[in-house]
Amino acid sequence: MLHLENIRVRQGSFTLSAHLTIAKGARVALMGASGSGKSTLLSTLSGFLWPDAGRITMAGADVAKTPVADRPISILFQDGNLFPHLSVFDNVALGIRPNLKLGSEDERRVTRALTQVGLEGMEQRKPSALSGGQQSRVALARMLLRDKPVALLDEPFSALDPGLRREMLSLVRKLCDETGQTLIMATHDLRDAERLCDRVLLLDDGKVVLDAPLAEAVANNAEPLRPWM
């Protein structure tokens, strides 16, 4: 389980406050208007920001005291953070070997990750030769390769057209089914959340104003969620 124990994160005049538990294998939609604290929360979980108070624990260990590279958390950003001068294979391999010095088992793992996301045969292409959906698959393969128990998705597919978004969300759902990863996805789109997630956390001005099973919140027309319905 992932515990956020009375955390408080200050960013200038903005303060994020949260106290919650996320069960292993949960798929959580993190929603809220721009500036509500979604990115601040994800940045804190991933180690880019430090809590000013409280702590984050997973399996009893204080996440903040763990070196970023060793944290049980990986993150997928909207732009994918692909390196244009590197091949698809090397972009994925960076997930486990930043120096790209791979052993034979590393190479097998990279190949397996590319196969899992449907990119076999494209290993030597450069990102510029790929479609937007294929680039998203490269970034997803890199996150998958890191094999962390918690995956954070910061609006990773928002730049894709609706059809490609559905395709990518279906792929993420399939991979989560296979790996049992805990997933937290920031999104502005309730339909995307419904395709992938079973729980919704809605932020407003740095505070959690709704924490509920997603299907139940939608069925009950939960007031904080109405602007997204």
UniProtKB/Swiss-Prot annotation:
InterPro entries linked to this entry: AAA+_ATPase (IPR003593), ABC_SmlMolc_Importer (IPR050093), ABC_transporter-like_ATP-bd (IPR003439), ABC_transporter-like_CS (IPR017871), P-loop_NTPase (IPR027417)
Pfam families referenced in this protein's UniProt entry, alphabetically: ABC_tran (PF00005)
Gene3D superfamilies: P-loop containing nucleotide triphosphate hydrolases
Annotated membrane topology: Peripheral membrane protein
Catalytic reaction(s) noted: thiamine(out) + ATP + H2O = thiamine(in) + ADP + phosphate + H(+)
Keyword tags: ATP-binding, Cell inner membrane, Cell membrane, Membrane, Nucleotide-binding, Translocase, Transport
EC nos: 7.6.2.15
Gene Ontology MF terms: ABC-type thiamine transporter activity; ATP binding; ATP hydrolysis activity
UniProt: ATP binding residues: G32, A33, S34, G35, S36, G37, K38, S39
Domain ABC transporter: 2-229
Top enzyme category: translocase
Oligomer status and interactors: The complex is composed of two ATP-binding proteins (ThiQ), two transmembrane proteins (ThiP) and a solute-binding protein (ThiB).
Function: Part of the ABC transporter complex ThiBPQ involved in thiamine import. Responsible for energy coupling to the transport system.
Family: Belongs to the ABC transporter superfamily. Thiamine importer (TC 3.A.1.19.1) family.
Protein's UniProt name: Thiamine import ATP-binding protein ThiQ
Organism from which the protein derives: Jannaschia sp. (strain CCS1)
Gene responsible for this protein: thiQ
